[in-house]
Regions:
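Conserved beta-strand -> loop -> alpha-helix junction used to position metal-binding or nucleic-acid-contacting
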Residues: 106-120
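Conserved non-catalytic scaffold segment of RNase H-like nuclease domains
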Residues: 1-109, 125, 129-147
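Acidic, divalent-metal-coordinating active-site segment for phosphoryl/phosphodiester hydrolysis
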Residues: 148-161
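Short, glycine/acidic-enriched loop or turn micro-motifs at the edges of active sites
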Residues: 11-13, 117, 155
Length: 164
């Protein structure tokens, strides 16, 4: 795949609507040409212990962040016409659909591809698992900031260029 937008969301709690950060990496002609990161005020606005433990974000980090529709207004023109790629895409696609619905925004029916599924299909038992950091390392990307939305989106972009 040569043209796409890799996307990753982190959530504040178990609710798919609680996106608290987003990372986007734009790939055109096989090259990373743009990236975007933003904190987002989650809805509902509370952080579960487990989610914070995973990504390190807290209520203080997003206290003055913009709400999703404001952030998406900046992202949408960047990804116009591009398929979206995520590692474990059902999660990220589910977040996107849920937050669009919650804010009563028209969902553009984005085309999603999953690098986790592609890894399972193409690499199978070559890898001990198909977690993002494992597959990224196999594809030559050193994911040192796992669960930072931008770092995860960049790792996903590296994987997609190799496997999709």
């Amino acid at each position: 795949m040569k043209n796409f937008a890799a996307i990753d969301f982190e959530t504040a709690n178990q609710q798919r609507t609680s996106v608290c950060s987003v990372g986007i990496v734009i790939v055109r002609d096989g090259e990373i040409v743009d990236s975007y990161y933003s904190l987002i005020k989650p809805e509902p606005e509370y952080y579960s212990y487990w989610n914070t433990r995973v990504h390190g974000l807290t209520m203080e980090d997003t206290m003055n962040a913009r709400v999703f529709p404001e952030v998406w207004a900046e992202i949408q023109p960047k990804i116009e016409g591009l398929p979206l790629v995520a590692h474990n895409s059902p999660f990220d696609e589910g977040c996107l659909k849920s937050v669009f619905q919650m804010y009563q925004m028209d969902y553009p029916d984005y085309e999603f591809y999953c690098t986790c599924r592609a890894s399972r299909r193409k690499l199978g038992s070559l890898l001990p698992n198909h977690q993002l950091q494992t597959v990224a390392a196999y594809c030559g990307y050193d994911l040192t900031q796992h669960h930072n939305a931008l770092a995860d989106a960049e790792a996903c972009a590296w994987i997609a260029r190799e496997l999709l």
